[in-house]
Design a protein with these regions (language model features):
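Terminal intrinsically disordered/low-complexity segments used for targeting and assembly
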Residues: 3-8, 14-75, 236-281, 454-461
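Periplasmic alpha-helical coiled-coil/stalk elements that build and connect Gram-negative outer-membrane
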Residues: 21, 144, 153, 160-275, ...
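Transmembrane beta-barrel architecture of outer-membrane proteins
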Residues: 66-68, 82, 127-131, 175, ...
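Membrane-embedded segments
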Residues: 76, 81-93
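Small/polar (Gly/Ser/Thr/Ala-rich) solvent-exposed segments
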Residues: 81, 101-125, 135-164, 168, ...
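Short segments within alpha-helical structural elements
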Residues: 198, 227-255, 303, 398-456
């Protein structure tokens, strides 16, 4: 036992002089540039203490039918369920790492029979051993500590990655839902246009039959009318495609998706994006990058710890009747041993592992910086898209009003023989185009607002 204490004392002295760094803790990245979102006036005006990212997805998306779809997706989506499984695996790894401080205990009983020739006959002799072996690696040089901290970082990383998958899932369902609403609106416009243009076509045919119009006018009018018919077919096909895409996200078979209509949907006039410091705590992909850097940090610590000696305590507690092993058969055996293993030459593997670990840590640091930059860029882009859609919205509304009046007036002039069919066709097609564009712009505004919500870190709660 005296030798054991000498070994431990020498190791502690080695640690005191050289091993301080291997116990260092990772310091999370907590600062970012105040200009991460950009410096334009619109960006600065949108910054406030509050942010739409603090809203839960249920508070942000208030449509009950959309909420129902998102709930179903969160419960059933296979990618999200796989992310949950990864979290459970990391939890198991962390639990095992925490138990690494404890000694390992093995029990390996054995029994046998030997036969001896005694006075002309074989005499069997039964032997047995009941050894209980204990091995304990002392964690003087933070091998287990760094493994535990690394496992904790991996767990946090997988939890944040689950949040990334969830936020992207919420975004995908919401955007596909808005696309369905857009297509429904476009189909509504086309069906209404179909009925109006059919009346115009019948009017033109009547004029032709009475000799007041040329067949060319009828053919041109019918061509425009049939073009609307083909657009109706295309939109209905796109509706089915979007419904199928939502079904895949929900992990269900293709079926009809219930949704509400846009009605009098209005784009928000003001959006709060919060301050840049909130981005680090809100965005799960930034947290993934931070914990990946933390994992690399503890890998480097472990690579450093591999240069230090390994101290093991071994014990044996046994009971047996093997006279060849135990001087006093049937007695108790107790044995203790301490060992120190100091790596001297490992074919350059230890130095190579340390260098690789340092380079990996540097690479993770670069990826973290790029992740933050990408996040700020996404916020800037989404905010710009929101503002463009809001600005164009008033123009499209006015354009539809003007063209509606132009279409009505031109049609009346044609009925009175004061306008040609070309003027009517131009007015009809311009009005249809403006109505379709107005609906598409509303969708672009909704899509941009959803993208901004996700870019700021929303959707995971």
């Amino acid at each position: 036992m005296k030798r054991v204490f000498i070994i431990i004392a020498v190791s502690v002295m080695c640690f005191a002089f050289t091993g301080c760094k291997i116990y260092n803790k990772y310091k999370s990245q907590s600062q970012t540039s105040p200009e991460i979102y950009g410096t334009s006036e619109d960006v600065m005006a949108a910054q406030a203490d509050s942010s739409i990212a603090t809203l839960s997805w249920r508070e942000f998306f208030t449509d009950p039918l959309l909420q129902k779809l998102i709930d179903s997706a969160i419960a059933r989506n296979t990618d999200l369920n796989s992310a949950r499984i990864a979290v459970e695996q990391s939890q198991a790894s962390l639990k095992a790492a925490k138990l690494g401080y404890l000694p390992s205990v093995t029990f390996a009983p054995s029994a046998g029979v030997n036969s001896f020739l005694n006075e002309g006959s074989l005499q069997p002799t039964w032997t047995y051993n009941l050894p209980l072996q204990i091995n304990w690696d002392l964690d003087l040089f933070a091998v287990n500590t760094n493994q535990k901290r690394k496992a904790q970082a991996v767990l946090w990383q997988t939890e944040a990655r689950e949040q990334v998958v969830k936020a992207n899932l919420v975004s995908s369902v919401a955007q596909q839902y808005c696309m369905l609403q857009l297509l429904d609106r476009q189909l509504e416009i086309l069906l209404f246009t179909d009925s109006l243009w059919n009346l115009s076509l019948e009017t033109q045919r009547s004029l032709w039959e009475n000799g007041k119009a040329y067949s060319t006018a009828v053919n041109q009018m019918e061509n425009s009318y049939l073009n609307v018919k083909t657009q109706i077919v295309d939109v209905r096909r796109r509706i089915r495609g979007v419904e199928n895409a939502i079904c895949k996200l929900l992990a269900i078979t293709p079926q009809h998706i219930d949704r509400s209509s846009w009605n009098s949907y209005e784009l928000p006039q003001r959006i709060s994006i919060g301050v840049p410091a909130q981005l680090l705590s809100n965005r799960p992909d930034i947290q993934v990058a931070d914990h990946a850097l933390e994992e690399a940090f503890y890998n480097t610590q472990a690579a450093r710890a591999a240069f230090y000696p390994k101290i093991s305590l071994q014990g044996l507690l046994g009971w047996g009747n093997n006279s060849g092993m135990i001087p006093n058969p049937g007695a108790l055996l107790l044995n203790a041993l301490a060992s120190l293993t100091q790596p001297i030459f490992a074919q350059g593997k230890l130095r190579a592992n340390l260098k690789i670990s340092k380079l990996t840590q540097e690479d993770m640091a670069q990826k973290y910086v790029q992740t933050v930059i990408n996040a700020g860029n996404q916020v800037n882009e989404a905010l710009a898209d929101c503002q463009v859609a809001r600005e164009k919205d008033s123009y499209y509304k006015r354009q539809v009003e003007v063209l509606q009046d132009a279409y009505t007036g031109t049609h009346e002039l044609m009925d009175n023989g004061k306008a040609s069919y070309l003027e009517v066709l131009t007015a009809q097609e311009s009005l249809l185009s403006a109505q379709i564009n107005e609906a598409a712009n509303l969708y672009e505004g909704s899509r941009a607002l959803i993208a901004l919500y996700i870019a700021l870190g929303g959707g995971a709660k």
